[in-house]
From Swiss-Prot:
InterPro entries: PSI_Ycf4_assembly (IPR003359). It is a multi-pass membrane protein. This is Photosystem I assembly protein Ycf4. One of its GO terms (biological process) is photosynthesis. It is found in: Plastid, Chloroplast thylakoid membrane. The lineage of its organism: Eukaryota, Viridiplantae, Streptophyta, Zygnematophyceae, Zygnematophycidae. Keywords: Chloroplast, Membrane, Photosynthesis, Plastid, Thylakoid, Transmembrane, Transmembrane helix. Belongs to the Ycf4 family. GO terms for cellular component: chloroplast thylakoid membrane; photosystem I. The chain crosses the membrane at residues 22-42, 68-88. Seems to be required for the assembly of the photosystem I complex.
């Protein structure tokens, strides 16, 4: 989502709060809970998931090899699921890109994990911007990047991970950004 007025342009960045991340975290939580409950059922000798397993004796799982491995996978998956849910809750990677012609600054803000560097803010001057650049890579892992080249040879990448934009959409965004910053466009 873009917000633009006369001298300010703000591009909002989604971060971890994506539908795909919510789906993966939910599936992982449910799946690993099933693994853990199955392993604990084999250890306790009781059906903790009675609607899933029939009460026949030949369907019981021995704890020694299978139940232990199921518990291990369940615990490991719960840790991974907790990590994903925390990243979603804290909106890691979310933030904004602000281009302010009135003050002459570019601000990149992202949320990180809690701690000393929770707020990540990078500021630079618009007068230090040399050009807006489009970089394309084709092949198995193809990607299109919009970046800003600074005079000191640094490169700031602005497109989001997970954005599946066509080359035309990437070019349109880059042209709009170059026009707003009043700098040349490279790599078209």
């Amino acid at each position: 989502m873009n917000i633009q007025s006369d001298g300010i342009r703000i591009d909002l960045v989604t971060g971890s709060r994506r539908i795909s991340n919510l789906g993966w975290a939910s599936v992982l939580l449910l799946g690993t809970s099933g693994f853990l409950l199955t392993g604990l059922s084999s250890y306790l000798g009781k059906d903790l998931i009675p609607f899933l397993y029939p009460s026949e004796e030949h369907m019981k799982i021995a704890f020694a090899p299978q139940g232990l491995v199921m518990c291990f996978y369940g615990i490991a998956g719960l840790f991974l699921s907790t990590y994903l849910w925390c990243a979603i809750l804290w909106n890691v990677g979310g933030g904004y890109n602000e281009f302010d012609r009135q003050e002459g600054t570019i601000t990149i803000f992202r949320w990180g994990f809690p701690g000393q560097n929770r707020r990540i803010r990078i500021r630079c001057l618009i007068k230090d911007v040399k050009a807006v650049r489009i970089e394309t890579q084709t092949g198995l892992l193809s990607r299109n990047d919009i970046s800003i080249l600074l005079r000191d040879k640094q490169r700031l990448v602005f497109n989001q991970l997970g954005d599946s934009l066509t080359l035309q959409e990437i070019e349109d965004k880059a042209v709009q950004l170059a026009q707003f910053l009043q700098v040349p466009l490279e790599g078209v």
